[in-house]
Amino acid sequence: MLKWNAIPLKGVNGVSFGMPRSEVRIVLGGKFKEFKKNKFSKNTADDFGVCHVFYTPDNKCEAVEVFSDCEISVNGKVLFPVDILSAKKQIEDLKEDSGSYISRKLSIGIYAPEGTPESILFGEAGYYE
């Protein structure tokens, strides 16, 4: 399992929010596939297998969603994959929202439709506004 660090509102594993797409691709390396998340997407995203990276219309990184084959630590504590109760202890304002758990203050979203976290998203400030 990969082990990455995240800094809420700043970035994940060396990828900073606001970083140009070309730099993100260098930092994460490897193969990627460009895709549109849905018909409302304003830009394409990059699928690196272990994560998806989302971009603003001007190709700046605005969010990174990481999947369960990667361990994410924040301030030296594992935040993902852990159960929702453990995540709530680390993120005080984590609120349930249609199968996801969202922290608007930290721009963090945990996708857990069946109660078990499947992915965690870190976004730039205001991502969930």
Task: Describe the predicted segments one by one.
Residues 1-129:
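Short helix/turn-capping signatures at newly exposed starts of structured segments
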